[in-house]
Swiss-Prot record:
<dbReference type="GO" id="GO:0140052">
    <property type="term" value="P:cellular response to oxidised low-density lipoprotein particle stimulus"/>
</dbReference>
<protein>
    <recommendedName>
        <fullName>Androgen-dependent TFPI-regulating protein</fullName>
        <ecNumber>3.1.-.-</ecNumber>
    </recommendedName>
</protein>
<feature type="transmembrane region" description="Helical">
    <location>
        <begin position="4"/>
        <end position="24"/>
    </location>
</feature>
<keyword id="KW-0378">Hydrolase</keyword>
<dbReference type="GO" id="GO:0071383">
    <property type="term" value="P:cellular response to steroid hormone stimulus"/>
</dbReference>
<comment type="similarity">
    <text>Belongs to the AIG1 family.</text>
</comment>
<dbReference type="GO" id="GO:2000402">
    <property type="term" value="P:negative regulation of lymphocyte migration"/>
</dbReference>
<dbReference type="Pfam" id="PF04750">
    <property type="entry name" value="Far-17a_AIG1"/>
</dbReference>
<feature type="topological domain" description="Cytoplasmic">
    <location>
        <begin position="141"/>
        <end position="154"/>
    </location>
</feature>
<dbReference type="GO" id="GO:0016787">
    <property type="term" value="F:hydrolase activity"/>
</dbReference>
<dbReference type="GO" id="GO:0050709">
    <property type="term" value="P:negative regulation of protein secretion"/>
</dbReference>
<dbReference type="GO" id="GO:0012505">
    <property type="term" value="C:endomembrane system"/>
</dbReference>
<feature type="transmembrane region" description="Helical">
    <location>
        <begin position="47"/>
        <end position="67"/>
    </location>
</feature>
<feature type="site" description="Important for catalytic activity">
    <location>
        <position position="47"/>
    </location>
</feature>
<dbReference type="GO" id="GO:0003332">
    <property type="term" value="P:negative regulation of extracellular matrix constituent secretion"/>
</dbReference>
<dbReference type="GO" id="GO:0016020">
    <property type="term" value="C:membrane"/>
</dbReference>
<keyword id="KW-1003">Cell membrane</keyword>
Amino acid sequence: MTKTSTCIYHFLVLSWYTFLNYYISQEGKDEVKPKILANGARWKYMTLLNLLLQTIFYGVTCLDDVLKRTKGGKDIKFLTAFRDLLFTTLAFPVSTFVFLAFWILFLYNRDLIYPKVLDTVIPVWLNHAMHTFIFPITLAEVVLRPHSYPSKKTGLTLLAAASIAYISRILWLYFETGTWVYPVFAKLSLLGLAAFFSLSYVFIASIYLLGEKLNHWKWGDMRQPRKKRK
C-alpha cells in the first residue's frame, strides 16, 4: 500500500512543477522575454523540457498512487511499469544532468550557458527552481520509493534515443535560424561539437548507472526479470 505521506509529497511536487510550467508560459508573454523564447520557443531548452518531463512523471506517479489505494497493485501493473521506466531512463538522468551540467558550466564561465543579462529577465528564485531544486527532488524520489530498472541495454538505448532526438533538434534549429540554443556551442568547432555531444551522452549514461546503483543500495535488486525463452 502506498504511504499517505508519499502520496501527499508526490501531489505537492506535481503542483510545484505545474506551477513552474504555468509561470514560465506567462512570463513568455512579457515584451522583454520573446527573444529568449524565439526560434524554437520554450522547447529548445533542456531545462524547460525537463520541467515538462518532471510534470508528466509526477502526474503519472500521482495517478499510480491513487489507483493503488483504490484498486490495489494488480490491476495497474502496466502503469507502474511505465512510471518506473519513465523515472529510471529519463526523469532521474535528465534532471540530474541539467543540475550538474548547468552549474559546472556556470561556475566555469557563466557566459557559456547563462549570460549575466538573463539575471535582469529571470528571477533568482526561478533560476534555482529550474536548475538547483530539481536535484534534491529527484533524489528524494529515489529514497522514498523503489523503482524497477530495465536491462542496461534497454535503459541505455532509450536514453540514447532521447539524446539523439534532442541533439537533432538543436542542430535543426541552428540550420534553420543560424543561432545556437546555448552560447557554448558557438565556441566549438565541428569536431568540438561532436566531442561535446559524445561526452554529454557518456555523462548522462553514467548518471543513469549511478541511479541504478543508488536504487540497488537503498532497495536491493529491483531490475525487471528477464522473460524466459520457451
